[in-house]
C-alpha cells in the first residue's frame, strides 16, 4: 500500500512509508484486502491528501474511520460517493450549513468541492473492513495521520482545525503552534448534534477567520448532482 503522493505531501510523508509501523501496516493491509472486503478502494486510500495539498490546506475537518457500507467511502472524511444516501452525520452538517447560510440540502454527500478549495477531509484511520467500524483501529494509521497533523502544525501559515467530538479533540495535543485556529463542538452525529453542534456555526467561523487573514473564503454550498 505504498503510495507516491503526487503533490507536496510526497516528500513530506515519504519517510513515514519506510518506518517499521508502516511496514507492519502494509503487511496487514495486503492481507486484509486479499481476504476481506475493505473500504475505500486501494486507489482511494490517500484521496484526502491527493485532493488537498500541504500548501493549499486552509481547513482540516477530522473524522474517525471510513464509512463501512458498500460504495460509500472514497478517502475523504464525512464524504460519500455520488449516488449513495447521505449519512446521518453529514445530513446534520448540511442542516447546520442551511441554518448558517440558507443553502438547500443537496441530493448527495460528495464533498470533493470542499477538498478542492483547501478543506483537508482527513480520517485518523484510512481503511476499514466492510460492516465492521473501527476494525483497522490501532494498526498503524494513527501514527501516519498524526504525522500529517504534526506537519500542518509546523507550518507558519495558519490552519483552521475543526474538531468535532472527543475522538477528534484528542488530537488537540498535536496542535501546539499558536498561529493555528481550533473550532470545536460535539460531533454532528444524531446522538450528540443537539447537545451543541447545531447552532455552533463552524462554517461561518471558518470564513470569518479566512477573511481576516485576507484569504479566499470557502464556498461551502454543495451542488446537486
Swiss-Prot record:
Q: Which cysteines are joined by disulfide bonds?
A: none
Q: Which residues form the signal peptide?
A: none
Which EC number(s) does the record attach to this protein? 3.2.2.27
Q: Which reaction does it catalyse?
A: Hydrolyzes single-stranded DNA or mismatched double-stranded DNA and polynucleotides, releasing free uracil
* GO terms for cellular component: cytoplasm
**Is Nucleus found in the keyword set?**
no
User: What SUPFAM superfamilies would the database entry show?
Assistant: Uracil-DNA glycosylase-like
Q: Give the first-level EC class, as a single word.
A: hydrolase
List GO BP terms, alphabetically. Answer: base-excision repair, AP site formation via deaminated base removal
| Keyword Repressor recorded | no
Q: Which residues form a coiled coil?
A: none
Q: Which UniProt keywords apply?
A: Cytoplasm, DNA damage, DNA repair, Hydrolase
Query: What family is it from?
Result: Belongs to the uracil-DNA glycosylase (UDG) superfamily. UNG family.
Q: Which NCBIfam families match?
A: PRK05254.1-1, PRK05254.1-2, PRK05254.1-4, PRK05254.1-5, ung
Q: What is this protein called?
A: Uracil-DNA glycosylase
Q: Which organism is it from?
A: Bacillus thuringiensis (strain Al Hakam)
